[in-house]
Amino acid sequence: MQQYSSKYNKQAILLANLGTPDNYDTKSIKRYLKEFLSDPRVIEANPVLWKIILNLIILPIRAKKNVHTYKTVWNKQHNKSPLLFYTENLADKLDKKLDNYIVDYAMRYGNPSIESKIKNLQDQGATEIIIFPLYPQYSATTTATVYDEVYRVLSKLRWQPTIKGINPYYDNKFHIQTISQQIKEHLKKLDSTPDTVLFSFHGLPKEYFDKGDPYYCHCHKTYRLVKEELQNEYPNIDFELSFQSRFGPKKWLEPYTTVKLEEFAKQNKSVVVIAPGFSADCLETLEELAISEKENFIKKGGKEFSLIPCLNDSNQHVDMLYNIINEEICLKK
């Protein structure tokens, strides 16, 4: 990140993403999962009972199991997870585009932490920090916990910076246009028109929605708006929505991505999948969708499977974030 004089640069933008292990070894994965799955926003359960289950059953099993999956998607050239690599590059590009702002990034879980980056920004002279959670759709399990951590950090500071936040952008025109254009460009590269474009969002326990989490509604709004942008141009393509990454025995938001893909496979359909809830490619897209779901889809009789990459560190993503920020806070020139 660029270094700025505190005398002239007092506003900063902090991009926040979910997080990642430092490496793909068991110890690193276990440490990351423990922090992530210990967040009461993520797992709503009896804290004493959950702590026992987490430490004695889940962490030993999942940490070891995930070594192979993380190793499969790891960016070995830069020794970083894809999520970290793309988020870092995204922040760098946005930093270059915003001359009058310090732009940095942090992870809610793992490194670099929100606490360390707030300190770094203050050291550079930032007296106002604009928090930008890179989750288009709001959920207490993602967006809210970013702000929980921000205010936990602030509660320990004697000199607190002013904090502002960028709203969830699930229905923002710049987001909808960018996702729509991304799908169009991908479809142009294909040899034939697919039968279906499936919008796969990360899942959520249904009881969270029943308690008032708006995530389900936000996902459907994104899906509907993008569909409206595309359906006239592609009348022969079905656009559908599903939820992936179910964890545990509870009922999650439906329909499940696995179930929908198996239905399409039995009908020998060709499918294009996009995961518009993820700002950067990660385990859930590069392994779960691109490998596991694809293999199962083909095995069950599916014709063709194509995954659209996340926006990652693309110029389109940088421009989209710039426009959203400018729309919300009227960037100083």
Swiss-Prot record:
Binding-site list for Fe cation: H202, E284
Pathway of action: Porphyrin-containing compound metabolism; protoheme biosynthesis; protoheme from protoporphyrin-IX: step 1/1
Subcellular location per the Swiss-Prot or TrEMBL entry: Cytoplasm
An annotated Gene Ontology molecular function: ferrochelatase activity
GO cellular component: cytoplasm
Catalytic activities: heme b + 2 H(+) = protoporphyrin IX + Fe(2+)
Primary site of residence: cytoplasm
Biological process terms in GO annotation: heme biosynthetic process
SUPFAM superfamilies recorded: Chelatase
Keyword Cytoplasm part of the UniProt annotation: yes
Protein EC: 4.98.1.1
Signal peptide: none
Keywords in alphabetical order: Cytoplasm, Heme biosynthesis, Iron, Lyase, Metal-binding, Porphyrin biosynthesis
Record-linked Gene3D superfamilies: 3.40.50.1400
Pfam families, alphabetized: Ferrochelatase
Protein function: Catalyzes the ferrous insertion into protoporphyrin IX.
Similarity field: Belongs to the ferrochelatase family.
PANTHER family: FERROCHELATASE, FERROCHELATASE, MITOCHONDRIAL
Protein name: Ferrochelatase
Gene designation: hemH
